[in-house]
Every structure is written in C-alpha cells, then in structure tokens.
Design a protein with these regions (language model features):
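Secretory targeting signals
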Residues: 1-6, 19
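N-terminal export signals
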Residues: 10-30
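C-terminal segment of N-terminal export signals and the immediately downstream linker at the start
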Residues: 26-43
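Active-site beta->alpha N-cap acidic-glycine motif
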Residues: 116-197, 347
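Metal-dependent polysaccharide deacetylase catalytic core of the NodB/CE4 family, i.e.
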Residues: 170-258, 280-282, 347-355
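C-terminal domain-boundary segment and adjacent tail
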Residues: 272-277, 347-395
C-alpha cells in the first residue's frame, strides 16, 4: 500500500506529458498540410486571344491575368506585382509577340511556387468564317460516271459556285478515297484540271478519310495508317485537280485520332483541325482525344493551340444538316455576341444530305447554306481557309 501514491503521481505525470505532446504536436500537423497551389486560371494554356479578349494598345493587347495562390504570398506576373483579394490574384499584361509565356510566381512562408502558361495572340484578327463540308464522294462519282463537259454541270458544284458568286463564299470539301459501291479516286479523270485551277481561289479539296465506313476509323488506329490514307488522297487530288486545289486536312473523319498522330499530321502541313468538343454520357467526343480540361475549354471558345504539335484546334459552331432552316439565325446570333465565339465562325455540314437518293436527304439543305452565308456576310464576316495563316487570318 506504501507505493500507491507514487504510482498515482507517475500516472498523472505521464498523462500530462502525453496530453502536452498532443498539444505541442498540433502546429506540426497543421504546417505539414500542403499549401494551396499557385495557378493561373485565365488565360488558359494554349488560348488564342484576339481584340475581343482585351484592350488594344500601341503594338499590343492588354489582357487580365487571374488566378489563385496561398493567402499571404506575394505574387508577381511576369515580374510585376499582382493585386491580391483573398486567395485570388489579378494582374494586367500587354501581349506584344505572337506567342507569350505568362509566369506567375508566389513567395511566402511555404516557399516559392510558380505556374506557367503560353498563349497565342491573333494580332491581325478580323471577323471571318470558314465553310467546311465533310464526307464528300458522291459528287466525284457523279462527275466521273456522267462525264460532264464541265465540273459545274454537277448540281452540287453548281450550287456551291452560285453561293460563291452571290456572297464570295469559299468552301473546302473533305473527300474520301472510295465509296461503298467501288468508286475510287483513280477513276476520276484529270481533264477538268484547268477548271479546278481556275476555281482554286474559292474551292479546295482535302483529305477526310479513306472511306465513310467503318465509323471512327482513326480513333484507335496507329498514326502510320492515318498518314498513309492521307497521302493516297492527297496524291489523287494533286493528280486530277492540281496542287492549287489541294488543302491540308482540317477535319479528320469523326474528329478522333491518336495523340501520336498529331505531330505527323503537322508534318504533312496540317495547321488547324476542327471538332465538336461535345460532352456526352461517356465523357467528351469528337475532340481528338483531348483531355477533359482542354475539351471543356474548347466547348466554350473558338480555338486552342496545342503547342506540342503546333496545331490550332477549332470548335465547330453549327452543323447545317442538324439545324432546321428557321433555327440557323437564332443559332448564329448569340455566337456573334459572345467574345469567346464571335471572331471566328466555323461553319459545317455534310455532302450526303444534298442528294435525293440518300436516305436522310434534306430538301432545303441548299437553302440552309444560303441563309447562313447571307447572315455572316451581312454581319461583316469574311470567307477564309483555315490552313492559310492563323485560322485564315494574317499572322
């Protein structure tokens, strides 16, 4: 019984020490938590910025740079102190070069952090539109089989020429190598080459795919297969229509390719690729297999540059075979009011819906094109080809 007080005293001392240890350890636990990252949120990496995204100043474009950083850190953007509001920061920066790297640096008790993004300045931007027609093969087969005296005896090309004469419209026709009934491009004669050449200022031909089927032919295919098919079609275009008529591809069938194919495409002259960048139940689709962040950004913006390949990606604004005639203007009008969509109109449709024998033939398809081109023309948009300059604009 004599050692009982001692044991009680030791117990109390031990308990106090343990409790003290917990209290003393608390600050260490807090300090070990990861600090908030420093990140530039606007502009987005790869953003294509034009006059609508900032203020035009002498030889430059003044933009806002926004982001987040640890609360007490000092933040600089390209060497200039940023204004802090809570964990946010904002700074102004003048773009003076075609490409600019933006560097945000934060320094504080947790050390130094930085985040970098690169943006592209569309210095000579102007309102412009590109008209692309996918899945072309029927008109080539029609001309080859009927042996017309002129290319424009084919109603399809005649319609496009009338739109050109009326509005100065330009078109790029994305073509297949073969049709399902066995027609192939080598069967198309070269006797129309002079007409193709004379029309090459407003009418171009480009590779789309080897054939319409199977669907998504390049989504899982190696780059070598895509490039081989591209080369076959390009060779034939140059043979029967001349190099003046050839355009590097701007839309790959289904808008899905392996990331490893982008650099080889760029080496074949591809400067721009268009897609839908649309959200579906399984994720993002017709997006060239971009990651979620870039796909989401492109769903809300005109364009984004992939610096690794050098290709600029464009979001298709409207698909006319899916848009009723009375919905064309209501679809275009809000785009023209949105600074992220207003500068460049990427207009799009598919050839097969013009042909009466096609199961889903659209009788007013030509009227839809006329309504759209009339609207963009009346609102000051100029026709361009995306493979020329920066999305058809001067560089």
């Amino acid at each position: 019984m004599t050692d009982q007080p001692v044991r009680r005293r030791n117990f109390l001392q031990t308990t106090a020490a343990v409790a003290g240890g917990i209290i003393l350890a608390s600050p260490a636990v807090v300090s070990a938590e990861p600090a908030e990252p420093t990140a530039i949120e606007e502009p987005f990496h790869g953003a294509v910025l034009n006059r609508r995204h900032g203020e035009e100043v002498d030889e430059g474009l003044k933009i806002q740079v926004r982001g987040r950083a640890p609360l007490r850190d000092r933040v600089t953007v390209n060497g200039t102190d940023a204004r802090r509001v809570g964990n946010r920061f904002v700074s102004q920066l003048v773009l003076r070069e075609k490409e600019t790297e933006i560097v945000a640096v934060s320094q504080g008790s947790s050390g130094r952090r930085e985040h970098r993004v690169r943006v592209l300045w569309d210095r000579h931007s102007q309102p412009r539109y590109r008209f692309s027609i996918d899945d072309n093969s029927f008109f080539l087969r029609d001309i080859a089989q009927k042996k017309y005296d002129s290319l424009f005896d084919c109603f399809y090309l005649k319609m496009l020429r009338e739109l050109h004469e009326k509005y100065k419209a330009r078109f790029v026709l994305n073509i297949y190598y073969t049709t399902e009934d066995g027609f192939e491009l080598p069967q198309f004669p070269d006797r129309y080459k002079a007409q193709w050449r004379e029309s090459s200022d407003w009418l171009k031909l480009a590779f789309h795919a080897y054939a319409n089927e199977p669907a998504r032919p390049y989504q899982y295919a190696p780059a070598e297969r895509l490039i081989a098919d591209l080369d076959k079609v390009a060779e034939q275009i140059r043979r029967f229509a001349g190099p003046e008529t050839y355009s590097p591809p701007t839309v790959i069938h289904w808008g899905m390719v392996q990331p490893a194919a982008l650099k080889p495409l760029a080496e074949r002259g591809v400067r721009a690729l268009s897609g839908y960048f649309q959200r579906v139940s399984t994720g993002w689709d017709v997006n060239y297999l971009f990651d979620d962040d870039r796909s989401e950004y492109l769903s809300r913006h005109d364009a984004l540059k992939d610096f690794q390949s050098g290709i600029v990606f464009s979001r298709v604004d409207i698909v006319y075979n899916n848009t009723p005639l009375n919905q064309i203007v209501p679809t275009l009008e809000p785009l023209a009011k949105d600074p992220n969509h207003a500068e460049i109109m990427d207009l799009f449709t598919h050839e097969q819906y013009f042909w009466p024998f096609y199961s889903n033939y659209i009788p007013d398809h030509a009227q839809r094109l006329d309504a759209a081109i009339r609207w963009v023309t009346e609102h000051g948009y100029k026709p361009v080809f995306f493979h020329e300059g920066l999305l058809g604009g001067a560089e």
